[in-house]
Swiss-Prot record:
The active site is at E291, H312, K426. HAMAP family: G6P_isomerase. This is Glucose-6-phosphate isomerase. It catalyses: alpha-D-glucose 6-phosphate = beta-D-fructose 6-phosphate. It comes from Clostridium botulinum (strain Loch Maree / Type A3).
Length: 450
C-alpha cells in the first residue's frame, strides 16, 4: 500500500481539544456500525461503501473498451450530466490531467478534448459549445438515471440531433454512450430502441456518491486516466478506514472535529486548496456535503475556496468577519511539476530572496502562513495532507470524504442519502414553463411574481 492521506489537527486547538474528540469516539463508532449494518435511514443507498472491491468487473472491462473507442474515434467528447452525474468525473479529469488539456495539440493530448454540457440551461453556453465543436468528430456520453432531468435532457436532445444530422442514425448510435438505469426510465427506453451502448447506474448508489460507478469511470477513462489505480486507491482507503479506533482512523477524527466545531457555532466549513486543478474537487465536495447534511433545519454549510487567488477576495472576511467559519485545507505534498524561480540581476521586483527556490516551495509557505493567520483570527484549521495528485489518491480522497459524510450525517441526526429539498424549485419551474398537470400552480405562481 502506498502512503496514505494524513490529518493534521494541531491548528484546530484551542477550539477543539483532544478530550472532546475522544468523547465523540463511541458515538462515531456507533454511527459507523449503523452504516456497516445498513440499519439507518437511507440504507438502500449504501452501495458506495463496498464499491471499490465489489464493482461489476465485466462492465468495468466494457468501460475501458468504450473509452479506447472514444479516444480512437473522436476529436471531442461531450459529457452530458448535472450534479453527481458530472462533478465527480470533472473533478478527477481536472485534478489529474494537464491544466490546459483541451488546448494541447492532440498529438500531445492523445485523448479527445472533453467538454461538459447539460449542467445549466444557458442558451449562450450551449450555442458557444455547438459553435466550437460543430466541425469536429464528436462522441457523447449522456448520464441520467431517469432521462427526464431538465438540463441534461435538453442538452442531449440538441446533441442527438447534431450527431444524427452529421453521421446519420446508424453513425450516431456508434458515438452515443448512455449511462442510466438498468431497466427503467426515459433514457433506458430511448437507448434500447436506438441501440446505444449503455452502462448502468446502480440502484443502491446515489448520484453524489456515484463517481466510482460508470457515471464517473467512463469519462475519466476516456480522458486517459488509469481507473484501475483509482479503484485501488479507493479500496485501500476502504480498508484503512475500517478501523474503529479513533487514534488510527482519520475519517473518525475528521468527523469528530468538524462536528465538535459545529456544536460550538462554527456552521460553515470551507474546503481550501492551493492548486487550481482542485477547483472542481471542491465543487464535487460541496454537493456531497450540501445535499447530505443540509436538511431538517440543520447542517454545516459547505463552501470552497481556491487559494492563494481567493485570499485576495475572501481573505479579509475569513480573517476578520463573522466567526462562524472553520477551514479544511487540502495540502498537496508533492506537485506534479516543478518550476524554479531564477535570479534577476536588477531585482527591480525585490524577489531575489526567492531566487533558486521552487514555486511549490513558495506555495507551501503561503499555505502555512495562511493556516497560522486564520487560526490567530479565530478560524480553526484542519489540514488534510495528500502525497500527490494522481488517480490513486483521487480514489483515496473520494472514499475518505464519502465515508466521513455518511457518518457525519447520522451524527447530526439526518438521512444523508436523500435530497427532498431539491424538488421545490423544479415544481415551480415546471409550472412556470407550462408543463402539463401544473396549470393551477402556474396561475398562482404568476400572481405571486407580479
Amino acid at each position: 500500500m502506498k502512503n496514505s492521506l494524513s490529518l493534521d489537527l494541531t491548528k484546530t486547538k484551542p477550539y477543539v481539544e483532544e478530550h472532546e474528540i475522544q468523547y465523540l469516539e463511541s458515538i462515531i463508532r456507533e454511527m459507523d456500525n449503523t452504516l456497516g449494518k445498513k440499519t439507518g435511514p437511507g440504507n438502500k443507498f449504501l452501495g458506495w461503501m463496498d464499491l471499490p472491491i465489489n464493482y461489476n468487473k465485466e462492465e468495468f472491462a466494457r468501460i475501458k473498451k468504450a473509452a479506447e473507442k472514444i479516444k480512437n474515434t473522436c476529436d471531442v467528447f461531450i459529457v452530458i450530466g448535472i450534479g453527481g452525474s458530472y462533478l465527480g468525473s470533472r473533478a478527477a479529469i481536472e485534478m489529474i490531467s494537464n491544466t490546459f488539456y483541451n488546448n494541447l495539440d492532440k498529438s500531445q493530448r492523445k485523448v479527445p478534448q472533453i467538454y461538459f454540457a447539460g449542467n445549466n440551461i444557458s442558451s449562450t453556453y450551449m450555442a458557444d459549445l455547438l459553435e466550437l465543436v460543430k466541425d469536429k468528430d464528436i462522441c457523447v456520453n449522456v448520464i441520467s438515471k431517469s432521462g427526464t432531468t431538465t438540463e441534461p435532457a435538453i442538452a442531449f436532445r440538441i446533441f442527438k440531433e447534431l450527431l444524427e444530422n452529421k453521421y446519420g442514425k446508424e453513425g450516431a448510435k456508434e458515438r452515443i454512450f448512455a449511462t442510466t438505469d438498468a431497466a427503467k426510465g426515459a433514457l433506458r427506453t430511448l437507448a434500447d430502441s436506438e441501440g446505444y451502448e449503455t452502462f448502468v447506474i446502480p440502484d443502491d448508489v446515489g448520484g453524489r456518491f456515484s463517481v466510482l460507478t460508470p457515471v464517473g469511470l467512463l469519462p475519466i477513462a476516456a480522458s486517459g486516466i488509469d481507473i484501475d489505480e483509482m479503484m485501488k486507491g479507493a479500496a485501500d482507503a476502504r480498508q484503512e478506514y475500517s478501523s474503529d479506533n479513533i487514534e488510527k482512523n482519520h475519517v473518525y477524527r475528521y468527523v469528530a472535529v468538524r462536528n465538535a466545531l459545529y456544536r460550538k457555532g462554527k456552521t460553515t466549513e470551507m474546503l481550501v486548496n492551493f492548486e487550481p486543478c482542485l477547483h472542481y474537487f471542491g465543487e464535487w465536495w460541496k454537493q456531497l456535503y450540501g445535499e447530505s447534511e443540509g436538511k431538517d433545519g440543520k447542517g454545516i454549510f459547505p463552501a470552497a475556496a481556491d487559494f492563494s487567488t481567493d485570499l485576495h477576495s475572501m481573505g479579509q472576511y475569513i480573517q476578520e468577519g463573522l466567526r462562524n467559519i472553520f477551514e479544511t485545507f487540502i495540502n498537496v505534498e508533492n506537485p506534479r511539476k516543478s518550476i524554479m524561480i531564477k535570479e534577476d540581476k536588477e531585482n527591480l521586483d525585490g524577489l531575489n530572496f526567492l531566487a533558486e527556490k521552487d514555486m511549490d516551495y513558495v506555495n507551501h509557505q503561503a499555505l502555512r502562513g495562511t493556516v497560522l493567520a486564520h487560526n490567530d483570527g479565530g478560524v480553526p484549521a484542519i489540514v488534510l495532507n495528500v502525497p500527490e495528485l494522481s488517480a490513486y489518491y483521487f480514489g483515496q480522497l473520494v472514499y475518505f470524504f464519502e465515508k466521513a459524510c455518511g457518518i457525519s450525517g447520522y451524527l447530526q441526526g439526518v438521512n444523508p442519502f436523500d435530497q427532498p429539498g431539491v424538488e421545490a424549485y423544479k415544481k415551480n419551474m415546471f409550472a412556470l414553463l407550462g408543463k402539463p398537470g401544473h396549470e393551477d400552480m402556474k396561475a398562482t405562481l404568476e400572481e405571486r411574481l407580479k
